[in-house]
């Protein structure tokens, strides 16, 4: 799932989804506003990303995470990503998202990742953003790795459950 302001986070999310599919996972890639938190009960891996704004996640992402709060997420895996400027001062939406996923009981399958963007300005005002070269490909490869790691973790959980029967 993703929130986006200028479209770059959607590009990253869709590249990540291609990687997950290549690894053999069934996926749904959609905007946070098109998903009800209750529908997440059927998902094994919840990947959430958004743009970094004013050092953290956007209001849309924060509201989605807040709505997730009461839903049982135990046994699910999570991954956080964001798009941000290449600056130590830019902050990280992914850091906020990762902490929130962990607080809700998800097992974070891999450390958060950021796709770097450059801003387009008009008269000093940000009017768009572009992904740094190679970020789309990097996130597709990341999707493959996380997809395989998720499959392996789910298989381990299944074997443990079978032994406990």
Feature map (PLM): residue ranges:
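Aromatic-flanked redox-active Cys/Sec active sites in thiol-based oxidoreductases
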Residues: 2-6
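FMN-binding flavodoxin-like domain, especially the glycine-rich phosphate-binding loop
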Residues: 8-11, 15-30, 42-165
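Short acidic active-site motifs
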Residues: 34-39
């Amino acid at each position: 799932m993703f929130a986006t302001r200028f479209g770059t986070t959607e590009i990253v999310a869709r590249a990540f989804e291609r990687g997950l599919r290549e690894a053999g996972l069934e996926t749904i890639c959609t905007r946070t506003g098109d998903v009800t938190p209750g529908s997440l009960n059927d998902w094994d891996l919840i990947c959430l990303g958004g743009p970094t704004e004013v050092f953290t996640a956007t209001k849309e992402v924060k509201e989605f995470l807040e709505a997730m709060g009461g839903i049982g997420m135990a046994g699910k895996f999570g991954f956080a990503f964001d798009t941000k400027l290449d600056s130590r001062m830019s902050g990280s939406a992914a850091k906020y998202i990762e902490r929130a996923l962990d607080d809700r009981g998800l097992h974070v399958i891999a450390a958060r990742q950021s796709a770097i963007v450059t801003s387009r300005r008009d008269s000093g005002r940000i009017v768009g953003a572009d992904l740094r070269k190679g970020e789309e490909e990097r996130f597709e490869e990341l999707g493959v790795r996380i997809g395989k790691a998720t499959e392996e973790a789910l298989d381990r959980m299944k074997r443990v459950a079978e032994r406990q029967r």
